[in-house]
Amino acid sequence: MSKRLAALFAMLFAVLVCLQTPALADGLPVAMIDVANTANGYYKADGSEGTSSDYCYKIEDARILLSKTDVVYELTGLTNKSVTIINSSKPTDAFNIRLNGATLSDGINIQNSGYFTRVSVETAAGSSNTVNKLIARDLTISGAGSVNAQYVGSSGGADAKLHITDAKVTVNVPTNSNEFNGACVIDGSAEVRFIATKDYAPLQVENGGSLTLKDGAKLYCLHDNPNLASGSYVAGLEMFSAKLRLEGNSYLEAEARPCTNPDYNGDAIVSYGGVDVLDNAKVVARANGAGLNVGALTVSGEGARIDAESKAASGVAADSVTVENGGTIDASGSWQAIYSRGDFKAGAGAFVNLESGGCALWAEGNLAADGALIQAVPNKDVALFSKGDVDIKKSTIIARAESGDEAIRARGDITANLSWLDLKSTSGEGVTGTITNSVVFNNNVGTVIGDAVTNVNNFIDRNASLTIPEGASLIVGDGLDLRNDGVVNVLGTFNVGNGTLTCLNHSGGLATCAAGPLCDLCQTEYGVPDPTNHAHLEHVEAKAATTEAEGNIEYWACSGCSKYFADAAAREEIEQASTVLAKLPEQKPAGNNSGNGGGNDNGGDKKPQQAANKKGTKSQLPATGDALNAALPLAAALAGVIVIASGFVVSKR
């Protein structure tokens, strides 16, 4: 009796567990099915025996039939039987399946597949599952587990839907391409891989459909042997007229196969409905054909990026190309890196980096850059070409035409304003057009035209020189850095403004006897002083000495080195003391002490000369050998003699 009670309690506990197992979003009850160990028959959701009129699922020799939309079928174990959904004619009702370590060798199939059937498949957290195929008119795959399959898709026409969120899905495509129909969305943290093993694209999105990647979702369209040449055209992601859109931090990677006939090399991504890469999304495409062969292409967002590589065609071929708001295209091709069948536009913050065998960027329409940075390096041909006009504003263009062609060429007009053009052309002319308020380098020799302002963090190469002519000016843009490792000759005006200057190589200026030269660009002293260059030489005129003040000879004094020179060329250095003329001594009055003007009416019997030369009287001549200074006392004495003689004659009369 106790054994029977224990068994009964165990059965009741199992039923309660089944009824209380967490379910999908609607909180539905869960029907636990071990697909490997269930006998044939009708079963209710709790696993008890049912009938043909009230069963939840039915086990047959070749099938496991699921008939209810108001439960969650949680499948575990391995089976070769087909898990078949008995289709509901109510498209609003979804069949809910949770995979929890299940291996379904024949996949999940739809009975009466012509109806619009909604199927929601959840992968239990941490579980690994294998399902041969998952297909429905409206299919959702979710959860924190993984599923391996040979086919996953939405069936039907444009009204079909596919949504993969969070789950990890790997599809090894054994034959024809896997196919999406209608609106297809991959989002959350989903990681989806399609790997082709035959000569077909891993994934196709049919006409009238669309594919959108959001959040942090990742999609890979790969081949198990991508370098093996096929006998026909084999793409990576083939979308025909369907539109491709990437948002958030989503990621797409696609590759194509080469062909034994190079004219039919596969393209990595084909979407004539257009491609939008937005926000922080990224696309990586590689092929022998085009990396991307698409309709209108837009790359917009600070982290939005396309990396496209073609070994035998164009990296990007598009009906039109727009890169803006910080978007990036990094493309390479053996033909063009970018071939636009219409216009090409690079807007604010755009970065375009191109390497190619032929022309790096070819636009059948107009080519415009406004606030962009474009680097273009072709092995031959021009760097940038437009059949229309080229209009460059507030942009930096680094273009290298290595084969003798112009760096920039157009059949229409070429204009550039407030831009930085770093061009190289062995033909001698980097660009011919109307250039205003810009910096233009041609083969590393640059000049500033008008009033230029930098628009990105520009760099002057070690082998380059830049001249700012008189009347021209260069200002570093707000928040930007100008990095100089070349030679800059400032004849006009340079201003750091609200930017910064990193000067790695100083040039210009003149060294003086007191200091090394000042860099033309940053005004930093560098090098060593020049002892022969007395830039601060002051001329001092000669001044005669007087009894009141000293005089000086003519000389030149340098305030830079505090030296004195006898000539204007500063070749003959002299001592400062030798420039000084001594002050003259004071002169005593001539005659006796009575103050008589020299007359001898008082009977004076001595001549003035005798008095002056009286023994013991010191000479009044200066000690120096200056002839002028020595003659002054003699002239005074002679004048005295004349006066006395005149007085004597008068008295005789």
Spell out what each predicted region is.
Residues 476, 628, 634-639:
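Cellulosome-associated attachment modules in secreted, modular CAZymes
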Residues 26-505, 521:
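A composition-driven surface/loop motif
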Residues 18-28, 622-630, 650:
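Sec-dependent signal peptide cleavage junction
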Residues 582-627:
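C-terminal low-complexity, Ser/Thr- and acidic/Pro-rich disordered "stalk" regions positioned immediately N-terminal
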Residues 9-20:
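Bacterial N-terminal signal peptides
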Residues 1-9:
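Bacterial N-terminal signal peptides that target proteins for export
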Residues 503-591:
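Extracellular modular ligand-binding repeats in secreted and cell-surface proteins
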Residues 635-653:
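C-terminal membrane-anchoring or membrane-association module
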